[in-house]
Amino acid sequence: MYKNSIRTRPLKRFISNHAKGKFALDPAYKLKCGLEIHTQLNTRYKLFSYTSNEAENLTISPNTSTSHYDISLPGTQPRLNYEAVLYATKLALSLDSDINLISQFDRKHYFYGDQPQGYQVTQHYKPFAKNGKLTLYGAYEDINENEKTIRIEQLQIEQDTGKSLYASGADMTTMIDLNRSNVPLIELVTKPDFEDLKQVRAFIKKYQDLVRRLNICTGNLETGSMRIDVNLSVNDFARVELKNLPNTSSIMNAIKFEYERQLHIIKNGEGERLLRDTETRGWTGSETVKLRSKETSIDYRYMPDPEIPFITIADDVVHKVKSTLPVSADALLREFMNKPYNLPIKHAKILCISGNQNEMYDHEQLRKYYKDVCVHYQKEYPDDNLKIPSNWILNEFIGNLNKLETKLNEIYEILTPSTFFELIRLMKQGVITGNSSKLLLFHIVNNVKTGVFTKSSQINLKQLINEYELQAADQINEHELEEICRSIIDDIKDEKLLQNLISGKKKTSLKFLVGQGMRLSQGRLNPNELEKMFRQVLDIKW
């Protein structure tokens, strides 16, 4: 009965506290956490066969992307795919790891339906790389510290397993899909350097961006291209491994629950008895449940694989690969957050961080487009900052690409950076208002999507402005502008709205009046002139 109370009471309290957003680490009970990340490599072929790597193809039929080796037909032998070694080299160098110039493959023995060989080929004794690190910065990531370095214990190349699919119903059938079998993985093991949840979340995001930037993995947890296990302990009691964590929110919630569970056990004086041995627990979506303990753990009987030669890499090869690595996200963020761009972190991340796989634009291509527009702008307006082109590209332009589902590479040669700058220049010259510029930009992107504009099209902005009568109403005199403003005010039935506006109690009402003026003029009036006239007519003092 006492054992049951240990399990249920913290569960009920955790769910209650978590629902109310009350989770917090207790300073007297230190969280120590490490991660094991399996990164599925998007190589052309599998790790030890010439089978096409279709791991990311979710529409392929089961057991159609397999070879004799993948299904472990007797007599078949492995042939190492060196593209996987190249990808591992890129990742190891990007994580500042020490690459073992000679590494080996080993057999990890266990029996499971989706592992037809009876063992997994991995690197246990001589892993591919060791002693790496990934540094998190408070200026770029959402962490409390100015700087936090997470040490990487090792990186190892290994083969993925197949998938077990459990059918519902009375027969309890288990089906095996071996399409994923022998797909190359890199297993990354960190030191237990994480001390709070913010650090864990920031590391996962930064690592996802890294593998996407290197173009070695999609980094998607939801599709299984990246899978993460968590090792966790409280106050240096025995480590608990958490499995079955399909996404970032599951990882966060599982850590919260497990911390609360161990905290309750320790506070009740049961730590020495219940947290003495390492154990593996699974996440059900609401709690962690015991899968196995030290007594029931598997003896993997590691042994060197006699069929696969050592991986031997020359120093000059490592240096050549290093010279091809892309600029780090941290360096790019520093570039765009400093002069001449001076972007806030939110906008800099749009250009630099592949937080999500965005099908509308490639980040490198977007950075080039942005820089080219800024170069044109600086030549014309050397004394101006770059706030205007930044806002137009990172808000209006990207917003239209996403809204209309139009890819940047489809529009790049039609709405060139110089043409985009011309749109901004016409707006600054007063030929067209900001609202009309937005309408014109939307029209151009939409015409690219529908095929009206093609790569052979020559966009003439002035011609389009005349065709759609988007010219700014620059011929209107002050008296006519005053008449428009008074007409809008006369149509306002809510006298209290005007009183609160004049007194300053509801200053936002002025934007409403300006919006009415822009609507009546179809965006052709200057909003600043409208606001100035409304202030004059209403005698606004604030």
UniProtKB/Swiss-Prot annotation:
Q: Give a GO molecular function annotation for the protein.
A: ATP binding
User: Can you cite a GO biological process for this protein?
Assistant: glutaminyl-tRNAGln biosynthesis via transamidation
Q: Which enzyme class, named as a word?
A: ligase
Q: Does the keyword Nucleotide-binding apply?
A: yes
- Reactions catalysed: L-glutamyl-tRNA(Gln) + L-glutamine + ATP + H2O = L-glutaminyl-tRNA(Gln) + L-glutamate + ADP + phosphate + H(+)
* Organism superkingdom: Eukaryota
Give the EC number(s) listed in the UniProt record. 6.3.5.-
Q: Name one Pfam family in it.
A: GatB_Yqey
Where does this protein chiefly localize?
mitochondrion
**What subcellular compartments does it reside in?**
Mitochondrion
Q: Give a yes or no for keyword ATP-binding in this entry.
A: yes
Q: Which pairs are disulfide-linked? A: none
Question: GO cellular component terms?
Answer: glutamyl-tRNA(Gln) amidotransferase complex; mitochondrion
Q: Which InterPro entries match?
A: Asn/Gln-tRNA_amidoTrfase_suB/E, Asn/Gln-tRNA_Trfase_suB/E_cat, Asn/Gln_amidotransferase, Asn/Gln_tRNA_amidoTrase-B-like, GatB, GatB_Yqey_C_2, Gln-tRNA_amidoTrfase_suB_CS, Gln_synth/guanido_kin_cat_dom
Keywords, A to Z?
ATP-binding, Ligase, Mitochondrion, Nucleotide-binding, Protein biosynthesis
SUBUNIT field: Subunit of the heterotrimeric GatFAB amidotransferase (AdT) complex, composed of A, B and F subunits.
PANTHER family attached to this UniProt entry? GLUTAMYL-TRNA GLN AMIDOTRANSFERASE SUBUNIT B MITOCHONDRIAL AND PROKARYOTIC PET112-RELATED, GLUTAMYL-TRNA(GLN) AMIDOTRANSFERASE SUBUNIT B, MITOCHONDRIAL
The miscellaneous remark of the record is:
This protein may be expected to contain an N-terminal transit peptide but none has been predicted.
Report the function annotation for this chain.
Answer: Allows the formation of correctly charged Gln-tRNA(Gln) through the transamidation of misacylated Glu-tRNA(Gln) in the mitochondria. The reaction takes place in the presence of glutamine and ATP through an activated gamma-phospho-Glu-tRNA(Gln).
Belongs to which family?
A: Belongs to the GatB/GatE family. GatB subfamily.
Protein name per the record: Glutamyl-tRNA(Gln) amidotransferase subunit B, mitochondrial
Q: Which organism is it from?
A: Candida glabrata (strain ATCC 2001 / BCRC 20586 / JCM 3761 / NBRC 0622 / NRRL Y-65 / CBS 138) (Yeast)
Taxonomic lineage = Eukaryota, Fungi, Dikarya, Ascomycota, Saccharomycotina
GN (gene name): PET112
